[in-house]
Swiss-Prot record:
Belongs to the RTC5 family. GO terms for cellular component: cytoplasm; nucleus. It is found in: Cytoplasm. This is Restriction of telomere capping protein 5. The gene is RTC5.
Length: 567
């Protein structure tokens, strides 16, 4: 239903408002319109609204069902809803208090992404930013002019009031940092919300159950992740930083709020029925998968999904390796990961190492093997924990001669600041797993040199300009960032900054992930392996004596009266 070029029309304010509402109306399916009408009628017809039937702010907020812990977010979103409901006049005309049916239509179209069916070109981020922070003037009653003095050529972007809005300088408008963190936290909590399966309260109950935690801990975990995202911006957030956050750092984080407003399309009877359904268990791929873990819970999954949606479905993940369970050794790592024939994601967390590690002899050895980057910025964020990840698009393998991976691989940082380092097209040093000396695994570096044949001295290793390295004992790690020219692009936040993050590893995990075809193949393989393992563990107790006699005859085990033979 895109807009076509047409001869300009002269319309009144009332006609313009009705025209936009009609275009919004056409973006919804009949069943969705039925749900919206049902919610509107059920709300306003059971209250004393007088002659003017409009939904109040309190009734609107109640339909959304935002938890009381997020009152600041509720205030932001209801303020935004009022601003968007006044489109296309926004802040150029006062609006009437409350919400009409057409107002709800407009709000849903903007937040759900359906605006792409109405606009040829559109910049939603400026409109969202301003709508969250700027209040419309409210009048007891608003009458739109019926004089046809507005020119409209079919393109809303060139319509006078809209054009005026986008030309307005909003550089003085700032998103208070604490409120921005609250907003991000709620988006992370809301990740995975499906309005067809019940209310926000049901969603939170489900997440708490699946994470084996409590509401307070869930909110705290999500707030910690939100702070990591917010550190990509400095101070209070202006429009430039808001764009950076939602264009580059977390481009998919706003999706949950669209689903929140889609709640208005589901009848209260449907929501009540779904809320009474039992919480569905979360089933990661493979019966031996573990969830949640030290590194993977709802907050982490939501944070990864904010920049890479296909990492956000736990049911498409399989535990391949967990350092705390399987042991911090390359052999254990290899045993867990090398059989997986689809993409995977590695997560590693650790504690930052100081420049002077006299108390950690092995840390000094690591420093000698991987020299520090001169001129690197000393972190001043006050955080001690770091968390990195790496997405590998091919199976793991040993790499004594050549590296593996492709430009689809990428390094990412989750803490203390969210950052992404995408794979470059031409370079080839995307990943290596090295068993012989000096050993270890790295992403973005060439295969290292071995110890000198005659001197027995370990030469300092060369790492890629943007690279992540773990030593052979999976005890220490290093993230190196020295600009362009490597297998991975520089930071999206600080591309020109020299960084050398060194850390003592606390946890390492690898999770298998893939598309539907990969996963179906892997499901069959896993089921076969589990059946075989179960079969091998099964002993036919009725044939123990017969089996033992056969093994004695074959010389595999010794009989009670049997003497040893001679060479």
């Amino acid at each position: 239903m895109g807009q076509g070029t047409s001869a300009p029309q002269h319309l009144s304010e009332d006609q313009v408002s009705q025209l936009f509402a009609q275009q919004c109306y056409k973006t919804l399916e009949p069943i969705e319109l039925y749900g919206l009408k049902d919610n509107f009628k059920a709300t306003v017809l059971h209250q004393d609204h007088g002659d003017h039937v409009r939904m109040t702010d309190e009734e609107f907020a109640a339909l959304l069902g935002i938890p009381s812990e997020f009152k600041s977010v509720e205030k932001l979103l209801t303020n935004s809803a009022k601003f968007l409901a006044n489109f296309p006049f926004m802040d150029t005309k006062p609006r009437e208090a409350g919400y009409s049916f057409n107002d709800l239509l407009k709000i849903i179209v903007f937040y759900s992404g359906r605006y792409t069916q109405v606009f040829k070109e559109f910049d939603p981020l400026k409109l969202l930013f301003v709508s969250l922070l700027k209040q419309c003037d409210v009048a007891k009653e608003v009458t739109l002019s019926e004089e046809p003095n507005l020119e409209f050529d079919g393109d809303w972007k060139s319509f006078g009031p809209v054009k005026q809005f986008y030309a307005t300088d909003v550089s003085e408008l700032k998103f208070p940092r604490d409120e921005f963190v609250d907003f991000l936290t709620f988006m992370l909590v809301l990740y995975g919300f499906d309005p067809s399966k019940g209310t926000v309260a049901k969603h939170i109950k489900t997440v708490v159950s699946q994470d084996k935690t409590d509401t307070k801990t869930l909110y705290a975990d999500c707030r910690k992740s939100a702070q990591c995202i917010s550190r990509a911006c400095n101070g209070d957030i202006d429009l430039v930083q808001f764009r950076h956050a939602f264009d580059k750092v977390c481009p998919h984080l706003l999706a949950p709020v669209g689903h929140l407003f889609d709640l208005l399309l589901y009848t209260s009877a449907h929501s009540e029925k779904e809320d009474n359904e039992p919480v569905a268990p979360l089933n990661p791929l493979g019966s031996n998968s573990t969830y949640p873990t030290k590194l993977l819970n709802h907050a982490t999954v939501a944070q990864m999904a904010s920049f890479c949606p296909f990492l956000g479905n736990v049911e498409n993940l399989k535990t391949l390796y967990m350092g705390q369970k399987d042991g911090f050794a390359q052999r254990s790592f290899e045993s867990g990961t090398f059989g997986w024939r689809a993409p995977s994601v590695l997560l590693v967390s650790g504690l930052r190492l100081n420049t002077n590690n006299q108390s950690l002899k092995r840390a000094n050895t690591f420093d000698e093997k991987y020299p520090r980057l001169k001129g690197a910025v000393v972190p001043d964020d006050g955080e001690s924990e770091v968390k990195f990840g790496f997405y590998l698009d091919v199976p793991w393998r040993s790499s004594s001669k050549e590296t593996f991976g492709s430009s689809k691989c990428f390094i990412f940082q989750l803490a203390p600041t969210q950052d992404i380092f995408v794979g470059e097209t031409n370079p080839s040093n995307h990943a290596y797993f090295l068993k012989h000396d000096p050993g270890g695994l790295a992403f973005g570096s060439p295969i290292p040199k071995s110890i000198g044949r005659f001197t027995g001295v370990q030469a300092p290793q060369v790492v890629g300009t943007v690279s992540l390295t773990l030593d052979d004992s999976l005890e220490f790690g290093k993230f190196h960032h020295a600009g362009k020219g490597g297998s991975y692009a520089p930071s999206i936040n600080r591309p020109g900054e020299l960084m050398d993050e060194r850390f003592k590893v606390r946890n390492v995990e690898v999770w298998g992930v893939g598309n539907d075809t990969d996963l179906e193949h892997q499901r069959k393989r896993i089921e076969w392996e589990e059946r075989e393992a179960s079969y091998r563990r099964t002993i036919n107790k009725n044939n123990i004596a017969e089996d033992r006699a056969f093994l004695e005859m074959a010389g595999v085990i010794g009989g009670a009266n049997r003497s040893g033979g001679s060479m």
